Amino acid sequence: MPVIFNICLDDAFIHSNNPFFGKLPEAYAIFDPIVDVMPIIPVLSFLLAFVWQAAVSFR
């Protein structure tokens, strides 16, 4: 368990010092959870396309 915790801390440390990962301005801090989920949306729509095709083919 400590190894997993250490990996998570190392990962957070890398992202905090990386110039490609920025922080939102204070005025937009309330949108931080939404911004964390936004990169997953294309993956979900891609998976939804497969589910839709499976549902259509079973008719």
Swiss-Prot record:
<keyword id="KW-0602">Photosynthesis</keyword>
<keyword id="KW-0812">Transmembrane</keyword>
<feature type="propeptide">
    <location>
        <begin position="1"/>
        <end position="22"/>
    </location>
</feature>
<dbReference type="GO" id="GO:0009539">
    <property type="term" value="C:photosystem II reaction center"/>
</dbReference>
<dbReference type="Pfam" id="PF02533">
    <property type="entry name" value="PsbK"/>
</dbReference>
<protein>
    <recommendedName>
        <fullName>Photosystem II reaction center protein K</fullName>
    </recommendedName>
</protein>
<keyword id="KW-0793">Thylakoid</keyword>
<feature type="transmembrane region" description="Helical">
    <location>
        <begin position="30"/>
        <end position="50"/>
    </location>
</feature>
<dbReference type="GO" id="GO:0009535">
    <property type="term" value="C:chloroplast thylakoid membrane"/>
</dbReference>
<keyword id="KW-0150">Chloroplast</keyword>
<dbReference type="GO" id="GO:0015979">
    <property type="term" value="P:photosynthesis"/>
</dbReference>
<dbReference type="InterPro" id="IPR003687">
    <property type="entry name" value="PSII_PsbK"/>
</dbReference>
<keyword id="KW-0472">Membrane</keyword>
<keyword id="KW-0674">Reaction center</keyword>
<keyword id="KW-0934">Plastid</keyword>
<comment type="function">
    <text>One of the components of the core complex of photosystem II (PSII). PSII is a light-driven water:plastoquinone oxidoreductase that uses light energy to abstract electrons from H(2)O, generating O(2) and a proton gradient subsequently used for ATP formation. It consists of a core antenna complex that captures photons, and an electron transfer chain that converts photonic excitation into a charge separation.</text>
</comment>
<comment type="subunit">
    <text>PSII is composed of 1 copy each of membrane proteins PsbA, PsbB, PsbC, PsbD, PsbE, PsbF, PsbH, PsbI, PsbJ, PsbK, PsbL, PsbM, PsbT, PsbX, PsbY, PsbZ, Psb30/Ycf12, at least 3 peripheral proteins of the oxygen-evolving complex and a large number of cofactors. It forms dimeric complexes.</text>
</comment>
<keyword id="KW-1133">Transmembrane helix</keyword>
<comment type="similarity">
    <text>Belongs to the PsbK family.</text>
</comment>
<dbReference type="InterPro" id="IPR037270">
    <property type="entry name" value="PSII_PsbK_sf"/>
</dbReference>
<keyword id="KW-0604">Photosystem II</keyword>
